UniProtKB/Swiss-Prot annotation:
Gene Ontology cellular component list: carboxysome; membrane
Keyword Disulfide bond annotated: no
Record note on quaternary structure: Homotrimer.
The encoding gene: lpxD
Any GO molecular function: structural constituent of carboxysome shell
Stated name of the protein: UDP-3-O-acylglucosamine N-acyltransferase
Database matches in HAMAP family: LpxD (MF_00523)
Pathway membership: Bacterial outer membrane biogenesis; LPS lipid A biosynthesis
Keywords: Acyltransferase, Lipid A biosynthesis, Lipid biosynthesis, Lipid metabolism, Repeat, Transferase
């Protein structure tokens, strides 16, 4: 794609285009990171020091960057074409979509698909080999359901969803529109509900459901459990990484981001815009407010107010954790001084 054509596409995107300086209207064939980019490739830049480190060895043909006079001066000194936007990362994401077309799957049902007569399938859907669709399940329009996926009975799947290979969607699950469920993820499995009695465990039946609102994306090997009654909810726009466990009856708000190996125990309530970094654990029935940020390996055992940034185990305000961490490193030295004082 000619660089000028790419600029026109970026202008119509969401990155807030400012200007473009094209030294050669070269054919852009693909994209690469700045340190390995070669001719006919495009990259993006958000930090001055990265450019300075790589400017001498990169052969990149064009760079998407922000409006920084120092960066633009360095690029112009090397005759590197540049596209200036307010958000280079968003522009680069759009460029990747333009340059790398996704493989199209023509609508159709593979001969090996098992689909119960009581189920309903919308228009323009693709069902790959060995897909199973259970009783009374309703699937909307323009869905792609890839090989080996099992969708059990009474499921409602909206429009424009992508279900990748070998997923399992249990009965009574509701998934709205424009969602992506990646491979080997299980939606709606039984919650971990057992009642102790006389040294034994009595199983609590899990008869609730899972509701996933529109524009949710869930990574590979995730589990979203259903509760005994009511529902587990993942609200609109939330993004979930790989290997995440969401317990029964959990409520997750809009536009949250959950990184790998997050675990949320049953009944927890997560507000809107929450960011949980890798391996964060949330205790059962805890309430996490809106726009909370929890750093990696954080253990949230009590309610967190709106807008807090928390770290550590148990979770505390980030500033307090930084101070505590600094003191912790000095404990051997402090202990030595205490022993010396005791001797006196």
């Amino acid at each position: 794609m000619l660089l000028s054509k790419l600029v026109d596409l970026i202008k119509s995107g969401n990155s807030n285009f400012i200007k473009a300086n094209i030294f050669e209207n070269i054919d852009i064939q693909n994209a690469a990171s700045l340190d390995v980019a070669s001719k006919n490739q495009i990259s993006f830049l958000e930090e001055n020091n990265i450019l300075k480190e790589n400017l001498g060895r990169t052969a990149v043909s064009a760079i998407i960057t922000f409006n920084n006079s120092e960066i633009l001066g360095l690029l112009e000194s090397k005759n590197i074409s540049n596209i200036v936007v307010e958000n280079p990362r968003i522009a680069f994401a759009e460029v990747l979509n333009y340059l790398y077309e996704q493989i199209n799957f023509n609508p159709g049902i593979d001969d090996s698909v098992v689909m119960k007569e009581s189920s309903k399938l919308g228009e323009n859907c693709y069902l790959g080999p060995n897909v199973y669709i259970g009783e009374n399940t309703v699937i909307g329009n323009n869905n792609k359901i890839f090989p080996g996926t099992t969708i059990l009975g009474n499921v409602r799947l909206g429009d424009n969803n992508i279900i990748h290979p070998n997923c399992v969607i249990y009965e009574n699950t509701r998934i709205e529109n424009n969602c992506v469920i990646n491979s080997n993820t299980v939606i709606g499995s039984e919650g971990f509900g057992f009642i102790p009695q006389d040294g034994k465990w009595i199983k609590m039946p899990q008869k609730g459901s899972v509701i996933i609102k529109s524009f949710v994306e869930i990574g590979t090997n995730c589990c979203v459990d259903r509760p005994s009654v009511g529902n587990t909810l993942i609200d609109e726009g939330t993004k979930i990484d790989n290997l995440v466990q969401i317990g029964h009856g959990v409520k997750i708000g809009k536009n949250c981001a959950l990184a790998a190996q997050v675990g949320i125990a049953g009944g927890a309530v997560i507000g809107d815009g929450v960011i949980l970094a890798g391996q964060v654990g949330v205790n059962n029935r805890v309430k996490v407010g809106n726009n909370v940020i929890a750093s990696s390996k954080c253990g949230i055992h009590c309610d967190i107010e709106d807008g807090e940034v928390v770290s550590g185990f148990p979770a505390m305000k980030n500033k307090s954790w930084l101070r505590s961490s600094s003191i912790f490193k000095k404990l051997p030295e402090l202990a030595k001084k205490l022993r010396q004082l005791d001797k006196k």
